[in-house]
């Protein structure tokens, strides 16, 4: 049975929109990682720069100081480690420590050395769709063009196709209607040769789904609904805060999909 990968979010920042300040010391980060592994995480995604609206850019030195001690403490755990960074210097420092994956929210567009660094260490990379919100074509067409172009550049740099993931970038450089369009047409991204990761957890899109004001934590059940929808559309991984809820849901949806496929094959 094909298992949907669960990526647990570990923000080692003081100002992330959902859990800023909770895990920005090594001891609390270690405890959170152990808990997420017990809850069913396949991948831990460590981030040292907040992406919340209005966040301040931190220096390279500050990002290194936030991320490296935590990565060093958890890299030996029995779980795949990803680092959420768009800086090749941070990526290389973490890859030297033994991380498996780089999650680049700018898909190599911010730092053109990113692909060669990831290729050098034979690691995986996630390419997330981003931008300034201005586009000359419909959002899904622009997303596909941009991501496939960057994936091609990653392959030229030496990263094999099976180590390149695509993320549609829900919550980044898109209007509410554009996010809804991307979600409705996820299968078009899934139809490419690359595995897709969906990252909606506790974001504005899930707040809009609720139809009334909520705190980030109150959006977990609706996040799980997007997990179920994404799996049915064919995504291969989800990036979430609430690992336990989404891992259980994904296991159930995976079973039902496998059951349906098996019965179709018998008919």
UniProtKB/Swiss-Prot annotation:
InterPro entries: DHP_synth-like, DHP_synth_dom, Dihydropteroate_synth-like_sf, Pterin-binding_dom. Mg(2+) binds at residue 11. GO terms for biological process: folic acid biosynthetic process; tetrahydrofolate biosynthetic process. Pfam families: Pterin_bind. (7,8-dihydropterin-6-yl)methyl diphosphate binds at residues 51, 84, 103, 167, 203, 239-241. One of its GO terms (cellular component) is cytosol. Keywords: Folate biosynthesis, Magnesium, Metal-binding, Transferase. Pathway: Cofactor biosynthesis; tetrahydrofolate biosynthesis; 7,8-dihydrofolate from 2-amino-4-hydroxy-6-hydroxymethyl-7,8-dihydropteridine diphosphate and 4-aminobenzoate: step 1/2. The keyword Thylakoid does not apply. Signal peptide: none annotated. Its EC number is 2.5.1.15. Residues 1-251 form the Pterin-binding domain. Its cofactor is Mg(2+). PROSITE patterns: DHPS_1, DHPS_2, PTERIN_BINDING. One of its GO terms (molecular function) is metal ion binding. Catalyzes the condensation of para-aminobenzoate (pABA) with 6-hydroxymethyl-7,8-dihydropterin diphosphate (DHPt-PP) to form 7,8-dihydropteroate (H2Pte), the immediate precursor of folate derivatives. Belongs to the DHPS family. Homodimer. This is Dihydropteroate synthase. The lineage of its organism: Bacteria, Bacillati, Bacillota, Bacilli, Bacillales. The gene is folP.
